């Protein structure tokens, strides 16, 4: 007969994996080996997608800011450059939210950026 090696620890480890695999299709939720493979893959995807989520949101914010800038007759890159010249410390998340929810406020920021590009000396910090 085979020797049993530390059964309580093994059982706990396997139960933990099967608990994580709950809701998976077919044998991936009941058989330890396939469940373990699937859980490891799922955790890798989760790790990868937490990083990608940040990139995706930044892309979304940039496209929203660009759409708002185009509506006001400006480009995204010029808007960001003008806002940095004017020492405006708003991040892209806030700018995208303003472009959607407060178009008049966003338009005033576009005008500020246009003015900062036209008269950079006016906004120089001395």
Swiss-Prot record:
Keywords: Ribonucleoprotein, Ribosomal protein, RNA-binding, rRNA-binding. GO terms for cellular component: ribonucleoprotein complex; ribosome. This is Large ribosomal subunit protein bL20. Binds directly to 23S ribosomal RNA and is necessary for the in vitro assembly process of the 50S ribosomal subunit. It is not involved in the protein synthesizing functions of that subunit. The lineage of its organism: Bacteria, Bacillati, Mycoplasmatota, Mollicutes, Acholeplasmatales. It comes from the Bacteria. One of its GO terms (molecular function) is structural constituent of ribosome. GO terms for biological process: ribosomal large subunit assembly; translation. PANTHER family: 39S RIBOSOMAL PROTEIN L20. Belongs to the bacterial ribosomal protein bL20 family.
